[in-house]
Structures are given as C-alpha cells and as structure tokens.
Amino acid sequence: MLTLKHYNAGVIDYRIFNPENDGLSKIDHVKNMLISLVYQRNLPFDTVLMDTWYAVNKLMLYIDSLDKTFYCPLKINRLVDDSFGKEKYNNIKSLEWSNEELEDGKIVKIKGFPANKKVKLFRVIVSTDRTDYVATNDLSQSSIDVTQKVCKIRWKIEELCLFEARFANTEN
C-alpha cells in the first residue's frame, strides 16, 4: 500500500507501507513525510487533507504544531465534547445540531486532546446513507460549503492514490 502526498495534482512523496521491513506505521510515514516537506524541502503548503484512518490525535496535534490547517473526517465512534466541559464526552453520531451549527460547524474538544485545544466540526451529508463528521483546526472556518469543497478535493486525491496503489501492485 502507498501513502502519497500531492502538490498541484502531482505526486511529491510516497512511502510503501511495509511494517515487516521498516517497523513503521502509516502514521509514522505521514509524520516523516510532513517533516520532510516542512524542514527539508521547504515546500510551501498550508493545508493537510486526511482520511479517517489518519485522523488520530497524535497526527492532528502534530499538524497543528506545524501551524498547518487540517481537514479530516472522524470515525463515528470518536468521543467529543461540545459542552465546553459541562457534560461528559459523547459519540459524534449522537451530537445534536442546530440549523446554525449545520451551516457554520460547531466547536468541540476531541477526547484525548489537551484541555485548551478545540476543533471545528462539520456534519457533511455525503449521500442518503452516509454522513461524515469533518474536523478542522481552523476555528474561523464557518461554511459548510467550503468544507464540502475541501472534502471533494480530498476525495479526488484519494481516488488518485487508489489508482496509483493498484498500478504499483500490478508492477510488482
């Protein structure tokens, strides 16, 4: 399996996921690619788009520490708090959404994040049988339309990654 980074629709870095040989997880590969992009290649970018499998606290907090914006759908079993500490954590799927929050997103704390670290969460209807809960560390982002556009870009990148992974597997 490949993990890829794209810049203007071109591949700029990839890693072959082979933990038996290198002992690295997919998260380790992504973090190493980010380190390379920021500190070695000095590639200018400001946003990281990720799939749910990469939306782990360690990686989201690392991206935030780089002063980069992230967008990632969270798994529906993630626990979040939208009460600012007044209530216990709830499953994302059980959150209640006002009409305003459906348009503008809502501020939540993800369980395991530092006490003062919040994200903006958007409820994105993907299809009649699928809803994504997309988190971003850009707390000023207040448009479901912008979030949906970002999600479409992420999906196009995902399609390219799937194609390239299939192609690489046929070459071996």
Task: Indicate where each model-derived feature is located.
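Short beta-strand scaffold segments in enzyme catalytic cores
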Residues: 1-2
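Single, function-defining residue in the core of a domain
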Residues: 6-172
